[in-house]
């Protein structure tokens, strides 16, 4: 959420240099320039966007590929990975700082504060969220130097649908943990405010009886922006090594 495929620019280059073909498809209404998306706020069309529509767009894309892909996603994209993998639409999945599936919630203050733009019961569900810099600092970029926070905010952040944010509470985000599926790696940052590592670990534990490979890895001191913050190569490298051993 709040991002476009541009946030994967370094990861795409990293994996391509190592022989992989990459795709970073935009969510519906997230494919235009950052400035254009900001200028359109508040967009009624964006306000109506749902998690179900995002999943449908990926199902359609995957159906047209010559082979099933490796799936990698961050935050709400991590939940998308879990849901698509449960449908057998990938050969392996990596869910980084993943939003929780239906039935899982955190009551940690950092989770509530970071997600308040979505959780606020008085907010109009049809009005997109335009995350402020201070909200981004707390929820995504805690621990980073302010110039780096400002640069990330300016380059990557876009308005987002509240309805997408509420998606994990709906049946669209329901997972059958008794069904076999391809291998899944869940990654968490110990300093993540918006998706605390305890929430990611609880997510991992839900798969305890799933007849499939499920692994969990925490990165010490990493925040929610671990896919692009300095040192992102450590996370990408671990992901690559895991995939080489799991996506056969």
Predicted regions and their residues:
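Active-site nucleophile elbow and catalytic-triad environment of alpha/beta-hydrolase enzymes
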Residues: 158-177, 181
């Amino acid at each position: 959420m709040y991002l476009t495929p541009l946030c994967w620019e370094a990861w795409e280059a990293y994996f391509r240099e190592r022989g992989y073909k990459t795709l970073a498809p935009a969510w519906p209404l997230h494919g235009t320039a950052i400035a254009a998306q900001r200028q359109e706020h508040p967009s009624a069309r964006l306000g109506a966007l749902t998690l179900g529509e995002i999943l449908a767009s990926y199902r359609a894309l995957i159906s047209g590929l010559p082979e099933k892909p490796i799936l990698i996603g961050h935050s709400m994209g991590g939940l998308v990975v879990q849901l698509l993998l449960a449908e057998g639409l990938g050969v392996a999945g990596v869910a980084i700082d993943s939003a929780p599936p239906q039935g899982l919630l955190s009551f940690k203050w950092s989770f509530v504060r970071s997600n308040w733009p979505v959780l606020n019961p008085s907010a109009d569900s049809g009005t997109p969220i335009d995350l402020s810099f201070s909200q981004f600092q707390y929820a995504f970029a805690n621990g980073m130097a302010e110039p780096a926070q400002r640069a990330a905010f300016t380059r990557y952040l876009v308005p987002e649908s509240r309805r997408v944010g509420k998606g994990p509470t709906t049946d669209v985000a329901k997972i059958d943990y008794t069904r076999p599926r391809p291998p899944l790696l869940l990654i968490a940052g110990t300093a993540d405010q918006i998706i605390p590592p305890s929430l990611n670990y609880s997510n991992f534990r839900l798969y305890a009886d799933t007849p499939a490979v499920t692994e969990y890895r925490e990165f010490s001191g990493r925040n929610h922006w671990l896919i692009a913050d300095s040192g992102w190569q450590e996370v990408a490298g671990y992901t690559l090594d895991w995939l080489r051993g799991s996506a056969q």
